[in-house]
């Protein structure tokens, strides 16, 4: 026999057997892992851990949070996986106050609803019953069943419930800086003074004449003008392109706006 390395088969057999045992153990571990995962998967979907346990609502002011949760259908027991969230969002957006809704899953069992509402710019007095109803920045008016409110920071509006320019006024109030809006306690439309004439009563004690057209731009300068006047002095403050103060029984006085 030629010189060469002789392979001892008997020595190799134990190595082959050990390799086969290791492969068998690995397959067994893999099968057990797959089975365990499958059982956990089935258990998860059969248990409460796969259902909604809590719903958080953010962004609501006029809409009741409880109503949002109930209308969304996201009650206890609803699946975190199969519930049609887009349908819940569409249902909520039927409410006249709501602009948009975003739903977010927060594992393991929580849902967060982010609600964006239209802004209330004033409270409109009804000529029919004298009640006040919220006027939104899109020009729509809410009835008592469509909102909740504990305080009124926006101006009261009278004589505008049947006016064709109500939507324009709502837009102008929305454009006006909130710091100025909060100083207006009441807005009164007086048609005998003009179709677009408005009389404002402010928290500073002034009576202001202005118009619906360019209301926001005209009233933006109000704080700078009011600080130059004595609220105890009787008269009318005209807030138009060029503001001036009309003292009672005296000539008009133009007011220079300080930058």
From Swiss-Prot:
Compartments (UniProt record): Cell membrane
Superkingdom of the source species: Bacteria
Domain POTRA: 50-118
Location (main, coarse): membrane
Membrane topology summary: Single-pass type II membrane protein
Residue ranges that the UniProt entry lists as topological domain Cytoplasmic: 1-27
Extracellular face residues: 46-259
GO cellular component: cell division site; plasma membrane
Keyword rRNA-binding: no
Entry's family note: Belongs to the FtsQ/DivIB family. DivIB subfamily.
Full protein name: Cell division protein DivIB
Organism: Bacillus selenitireducens (strain ATCC 700615 / DSM 15326 / MLS10)
Gene: divIB
